[in-house]
Amino acid sequence: LLWCWRVWFFFTLSGFDYSRHSIPLDDISDGGPGKDGIPSIDNPHFLTVGEADQSLMQNEDRVTGFVFNDQAREYPIKILNWHEIVNDRVGGNPVVISFCPLCGTGMVFDAHVENRNLKFGVSGLLYQSDMLLTITKQKFYERKLNRRR
């Protein structure tokens, strides 16, 4: 009975639908801030190396970077530490950049799924000490992507 109450409380408290999942629910933990409690960066503004002075970036600063369709992008870790998610477009293609300060991992994903451009946010939840992303239009996600990936 205690386990059932804990699961019900977790489901309703966090506001997510966990009826379909591919990871053990017992391994999901509260990461502190709630859903979108850490604001993502949407449509970021970029500076050239010449525009950025040394107060913004140092040569030894870490970045998460990638090249897509011959376009290179870098996202400073000191910015990602505070926002964790960037929704961006590269060559007209939507991408999401995530960085988990807790485990120090950064990833880049294609945000175009099933003919839709998706926007991601911070869920406030962790799986094995790594952040879980949420799609900001969750009702669309539940309705359109109703199969496990």
Predicted segments with their positions:
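Intrinsically disordered, flexible peripheral segments
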Residues: L1-R149
